[in-house]
C-alpha cells in the first residue's frame, strides 16, 4: 500500500466533513467490526461519511491515492465485503435518515439504515415495503442484492419497489438512476450488488401494512404414507 503523507491527508480532511480514523485512533477498532465477528481486516484508514458530498470526496481520494476501497452500509454481509485490509474503508453507517412522503407513499432512505430503522419510520404511518427478515440487516446491501422477505408474496421483491437511487460512481460522478434516467445503471443496481457505485439514497414505494399484523406457522399433515 502507498504510504499517505500528512499533506495528502490534510488536503483530504479540508474537503471532508465526517470523521477520519487511523489504526491508532480510539474508535478505529470498534468501527471496523461488523456483524460477522470472524472478519478481522484492518483498513489503512476509515472515513465515516455524513453526506453524499463526503462519499464523493472519499471516492475521489481513494482513486487519487490508488487505494483499495470497501464500502460499509449496515455491515451485515457474511463475507465481510464492508472491510478491506490496508485500504480505504468508506463507512456509511452514520447516514441513517429516513423520510416518508404520505401523499405519494414513498420513502427516501440513506444507506446506513438497517431494516429496523426503515420499518420503524414507515410503520409510524402504517406503511411498509418488502424488506428482509432480520432487523439488523442493512437496507443498502439487501436492496442491491435483490431483497425478499415477509411481504414479497404480496408486493414483490425489494427491487420491485425501488423507484430511484442516487449513486456515486467509481469515477466520482454523482448520478440519479431510475426507470427513465440512467436506466441501464438502474437496471444494474436492481440485483447487481455493489458493482456499479455507492448508493447514497434510495427511493422506495410504500404500501399500507398494519399496524396490527397476524402471523404464525401453518403446518400441513404429511401426504406420505407412514413407515
Residue ranges and their predicted role:
Residues 1-148, 153-154, 161, 196, ...:
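N-terminal accessory segments
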Residues 22, 128, 165-166, 170-227:
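C-terminal cap/substrate-recognition region of VAO/PCMH-type FAD-linked oxidoreductases
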Amino acid at each position: 500500500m502507498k504510504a499517505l503523507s500528512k499533506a495528502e491527508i490534510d488536503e483530504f480532511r479540508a474537503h471532508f466533513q465526517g470523521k477520519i480514523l487511523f489504526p491508532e485512533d480510539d474508535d478505529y477498532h470498534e468501527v471496523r467490526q461488523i456483524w460477522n465477528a470472524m472478519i478481522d481486516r484492518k483498513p489503512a484508514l476509515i472515513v465515516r461519511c455524513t453526506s453524499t458530498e463526503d462519499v464523493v470526496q472519499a471516492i475521489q481520494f481513494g482513486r487519487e491515492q490508488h487505494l483499495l476501497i470497501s464500502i460499509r452500509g449496515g455491515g451485515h454481509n457474511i463475507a465481510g465485503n464492508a472491510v478491506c485490509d490496508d485500504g480505504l474503508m468508506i463507512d456509511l453507517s452514520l447516514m441513517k435518515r429516513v423520510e416518508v412522503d404520505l401523499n405519494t407513499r414513498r420513502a427516501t432512505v440513506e444507506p446506513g439504515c438497517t431494516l429496523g430503522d426503515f420499518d420503524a419510520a414507515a410503520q409510524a404511518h402504517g406503511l411498509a415495503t418488502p424488506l428482509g427478515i432480520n432487523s439488523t440487516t442493512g437496507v443498502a446491501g439487501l436492496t442491491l442484492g435483490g431483497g425478499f422477505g415477509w411481504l414479497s408474496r404480496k408486493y414483490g421483491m425489494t427491487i420491485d419497489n425501488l423507484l430511484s437511487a442516487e449513486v456515486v460512481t467509481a469515477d466520482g460522478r454523482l448520478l440519479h438512476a431510475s426507470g427513465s434516467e440512467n436506466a441501464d445503471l438502474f437496471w444494474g443496481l436492481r440485483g447487481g450488488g455493489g458493482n456499479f457505485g455507492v448508493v447514497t439514497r434510495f427511493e422506495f414505494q410504500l404500501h399500507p401494512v398494519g399496524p396490527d399484523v397476524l402471523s404464525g406457522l401453518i403446518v400441513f399433515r404429511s401426504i406420505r404414507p407412514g413407515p
